[in-house]
Every structure is written in C-alpha cells, then in structure tokens.
Amino acid sequence: EWIGLKSIKRVKDSDLISWIIGGFLLFTIFYMFVFPLTRSIETATSAFSGMGYKALPSILIYSILQTSLPEELLFRGFLLKRMANHMPFVFANTIQAIAFGLLHGVLFASVVSLEVTFFIIFFTGAIAAYLGFVNEKKAGGSILTSWIIHALANILSGLVAAFSLL
C-alpha cells in the first residue's frame, strides 16, 4: 500500500472515467504530434510493425506488465510518494514529472533533433504530472488509475504499429 498498489478511493464512477479518458486523450494528442517525428526510428513498439492480430498478446503483455506497471511503480508509486512525504506535493509531482520526461527524451536524443527531444521531454513530463495529480488528488493515492491510463496509451501505440495505422 505504501507504493500505491491499493484500491482507488471511492469517487463517482463517472468522475474516475472522466479522469481516465482525459489522460488517454492527452496521450493521444501527444502521440499524434510525436509519431510523425519518430516514424522512421526504431522504438519499443517497432517489433509489432505490420503483425496485425498476431501481435495482440505481445502488445498486451508489453503494455500492461513490461512498461506501464514498472514505470508507474517507480515514478508515481515510489518517487512521487517518497518525495511528497518531505516536500509539498506540487514540488514532488514536478520533480517526478521532469524525471519521467527526461527518461523518455533521453531515449530519443541521439536519433532526433534537439527540438524534438525537448518536445518529447515536455509532453511526457506533462502527462506524468497529470498522472501524479490524478493518483494523489483524485484516486486517494492509488496508482491503479495511472496504470490504466498508461497501459491504454501503450496499447494504442502497439496497435498503431501492428496495424500500420499511421
């Protein structure tokens, strides 16, 4: 429970669904801008390219267990929660968001322009700040909400690659 693996605080289902949809839409907007800039680059979802339905089990395992769960445990579960015990939430959330953005930006820094790298850092950081806010202020400290949003976003990325949608 100290890391946020606990049930979501009682909120109206419609409110929770709105926060989840909002996070997913935020990611989708980001993805629509970034994908064309990184299309020719080998990414984590490149392995699914053109595989269609055959990739679905791999996409689900990758999206739910390999990426979103460990990242949510580390950034929102561990880092944010530990720092929020020692500083105001807004500072702790900003730090974890910057760390999350930097991690994702650094992965692309050697293969995209500096501008694209900063774009990736900024938007993944903004999404991370949103996820931290939703977890701590709307879901009672549970990371399940951000895990759902993050997993859905990664599933979308995998499906786009598998079915060559963009």
Indicate where each model-derived feature is located.
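Short alpha-helical catalytic segment bearing the HExxH-like zincin motif
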Residues: 64-69, 73, 93, 101, ...
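Membrane-interface helix/loop boundary segments of multi-pass membrane proteins
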Residues: 70-95, 135-141
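Hydrophobic alpha-helical transmembrane segments
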Residues: 16-21, 57-60, 90-95, 118-122, ...
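Small-polar-interrupted transmembrane alpha-helices in polytopic inner-membrane proteins
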Residues: 90-105, 124-128
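Functionally important transmembrane alpha-helices
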Residues: 114-166
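Aromatic-anchored segments of alpha-helical transmembrane domains
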Residues: 24-33, 97-107, 151-159
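Juxtamembrane helix-loop-helix connectors linking adjacent transmembrane helices
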Residues: 1-70, 85, 112, 116
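Active-site His/Glu-centered metal-binding helix of metallohydrolases
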Residues: 69-74, 78-79, 83, 102, ...
